[in-house]
Amino acid sequence: MWGLVRLLLAWLGGWGCMGRLAAPARAWAGSREHPGPALLRTRRSWVWNQFFVIEEYAGPEPVLIGKLHSDVDRGEGRTKYLLTGEGAGTVFVIDEATGNIHVTKSLDREEKAQYVLLAQAVDRASNRPLEPPSEFIIKVQDINDNPPIFPLGPYHATVPEMSNVGTSVIQVTAHDADDPSYGNSAKLVYTVLDGLPFFSVDPQTGVVRTAIPNMDRETQEEFLVVIQAKDMGGHMGGLSGSTTVTVTLSDVNDNPPKFPQSLYQFSVVETAGPGTLVGRLRAQDPDLGDNALMAYSILDGEGSEAFSISTDLQGRDGLLTVRKPLDFESQRSYSFRVEATNTLIDPAYLRRGPFKDVASVRVAVQDAPEPPAFTQAAYHLTVPENKAPGTLVGQISAADLDSPASPIRYSILPHSDPERCFSIQPEEGTIHTAAPLDREARAWHNLTVLATELGWSWGPERGWVPLLVAEWSAPAAPPQRSPVGSAVGIPQDSSAQASRVQVAIQTLDENDNAPQLAEPYDTFVCDSAAPGQLIQVIRALDRDEVGNSSHVSFQGPLGPDANFTVQDNRDGSASLLLPSRPAPPRHAPYLVPIELWDWGQPALSSTATVTVSVCRCQPDGSVASCWPEAHLSAAGLSTGALLAIITCVGALLALVVLFVALRRQKQEALMVLEEEDVRENIITYDDEGGGEEDTEAFDITALQNPDGAAPPAPGPPARRDVLPRARVSRQPRPPGPADVAQLLALRLREADEDPGVPPYDSVQVYGYEGRGSSCGSLSSLGSGSEAGGAPGPAEPLDDWGPLFRTLAELYGAKEPPAP
C-alpha cells in the first residue's frame, strides 16, 4: 500500500502540497516470502489531494512540481508510476522510476484553471496494479496578467439639461479576467480621466453622475467623458483599461420666445380678399422640438377685426392674414400688437419665464383700382303683371370709390334674362319692362346686373390712363385687354373695373284669370234617386294669387224647370243636387251649365258644363246600365255582339288579302311583265362610229316574237355583244327559228338569277380586241363591211361552239336562194 507521498518544494517553497487527506488502508495479501493468510492492519494511503502551478511560468527545462512515492516501493526498481488524466503526457509528465511530476510548458489560468489527473503504482515487470488509482488536482495559480476591459463600451448617454448635481447619467462596468478569489488581481477602482468638472464616477460601482448644476444645452450640447478602471485596488503596479462615455444634454423648455425686432411693418392691397396672406412673424426660441412650439395672437388695437393670425404647420411662424375686406378710402393703416407664447411650459422652469413675448405690427393698406360699389348688396324690385313694355321697374345705383366723377355703365347679363323681359338704361341704371309679364307663367325674375367703370382705367404701369369710350353694348363674353388709347366698350381690366349685383324682380298679381273648374266632371245619377240627393262636389280654381280676388262663387241653372241645382259651399266648392222633383228619364246625358265668378274688381266669370248621365242602378247603388247603352240594346245588338261581328269581319278580310297576295306572287314568278321587257341600252365605244347606225338598240319584243316581228331595216344588222359572265350548262341546239323565244326566255331567266351579271339598263364599255385575235373584234362596229355594210361571215361564231351557232344563224348573213 502507499505509505507516504512526499511533496518536494522548489525554490522558496513555491511548489508544495496544499494539505493532507487520510484514508483507511485496504487489506493486502501476503507476500511471496510469507505465505499463508494475510495479516490485516491499518495502512496509510494517499495523503494529498491537490498541487499548485504558477501560471505563465516558463523555465529552461521542465519544472518539477512534486513527487509521488508509495511504501510498497522498496527501492528495488520493481515499482513503476503511471499518470493519466487531463494533460497527462503532454502538459504533465512523470518519472516512472522516481514518481517526479514535471510541467512541460507555460500555463494560462484564464484558459484552464485546474487539471484532474489519476496516479497509480504498478509492477514494472507484470504491469499489475500495486494500488488502486487515486485522483488528484493540479491548480494553476493566478497572477495579475489581464488588464480590465469594458465589454459594452464606448457608451452613449442622455441627461436633461439643467439637471441637479448628482443626477445619474449611466453606469459603466469593466471586467477583469484574473481570479477574483486570489489576491487583488481582479479588484477594480473607477476614476474619471477626462470630463471634469462636469461629471464624476463612483469608484466602486462605476455610476457616472453630474458634478455641476445648470448645464445648458444651448451653451454645450455634448460632452465626452473618459472613465478608467484599474485593478489591484487602484494601487501602483495594477493594470488599467479605459472607455469613453458620450453624454448628450436633452432639451427642456427653459428659454422663452423672443421677437428679433420690436416692430413689424407690412402692406396689403385693399382688394385682397379674406384669407390673403399679409406676412409672417417668427419669434426665436433656442429650444428644440415641442419645447419651441408657439402660438400667436393679436392682443389689442384695431387690427383684431381686420386681421387674424395663426401658427403654421411647423408651429414656428405666425401667419398674418386678412380677416375682412379692406377699404383704402375708409382706413389706410392698422396698428396692433402680436404676442408669441410657448404652448408647452414645464412648471419646473417657471422661474426662467415668462415664456412669451410681444411685438408691434403696422399694416399699410395700398390703394388699388376697385370695381364700382353698389349701394345695396342685392336689390328687390316689384312690377305688376300685364304692364305695357317700357314700364319702370326700379333703379339700381353704383359708384366709383376711386374716382367719383367716373361714369358708370349698367347692363344685364344675357344668361340671367334669356327671354329679354327687361332692359336697363346704361347711364342711369333704371330697369324697364321689355315685354308684358304674366305672374302665372313666372312670378320671379332673377337678373344679374353688371356695373362697369368707364373713362379711366388702371394701366399696366400702375397709373391712371384715359380710355376712348365707344358705343356700349352688353358683352356676351368677358372682354379682352385693349391697348392704351384704343376705343373700347368696357374697361381695360374687366376683373378690376366691373362688379355684379343680383336683382330679384317680383311680378305682382292682378285679377286677370277667370275661375275654372278644377277638372272635367262627368258623373251619373240613379233613376231611382231621391229628391235633394248630392250628385257631385264641384271644385274650382283661380290661377290668380291667393287673397287677390281668388275666392270663387258658383251659380247653377235657375227656374222651376231646372233638372239640377247648384249649392255654393263658400269654400271654393259647390254641391250638385237633384231638384225637389225626380229627373225625368232620358237617353242622352244632361249638360248642366254652371257659372263661376271671382270677387275681383272688376269681377271675372266663366261658364263650365257638368255632364250628368241618368243610369239604372242595382239595389246596392252600383250602376247596371245607363240610358245610352239601353238605347243600343233596344236595337237588338249588345256590345258583346258588336265585338264578335267586328272580329269575324276582320278575320275574313285578312284571309282574303293573304290569298290575293300569294296568287299574285305565283303569277309574277311564271311570267315576265311587259314593263320589265322595255329596256334601253347605252353602248359606248372607244372609237368613233359611223353615226346613229352604230347606236341603234335592238327590240327585245321582236326577239321574243320572231314570227310577228317587223322585217329588219336595210343596212348592217345591229348586234348586242355581251360576253357571258357566268358559265351555263350545255343545251341542245334548237331545231329551228320558231323556238328562239323560248331560248331567249331561258337565257333571260338565267341572267336574272345570276348575281354576277349587271342589269340590262346599264352602260357597257367594250375594249378593242385588235387584229391579233382569231375571231376579230366583237364590237358591232366591225359587224359590217367598210364597203357597203355587207354582213360579215358567220364562220368564226360557229367555231365558238353551239351557244354561238344559234346567234350566227339569227344574225349572220344568209345566202340568197338560187334562181
Curated annotation (Swiss-Prot):
Sequence segments annotated as region (Disordered): 768-800
On the Cytoplasmic side, which residues? 663-819
What range does the record give for the signal peptide?
A: 1-19
Name the SMART domains for this protein.
Answer: CA
MF annotations from Gene Ontology: alpha-catenin binding; beta-catenin binding; cadherin binding; calcium ion binding; delta-catenin binding
Record has Transmembrane helix as a keyword: yes
Cite the entry's keywords alphabetically: Calcium, Cell adhesion, Cell membrane, Cleavage on pair of basic residues, Glycoprotein, Membrane, Metal-binding, Repeat, Signal, Transmembrane, Transmembrane helix
Transmembrane segments in this chain: where? Answer: 642-662
Q: Cellular location of this protein?
A: Cell membrane
| Name of the protein in its database record | Cadherin-24
- The organism is Homo sapiens
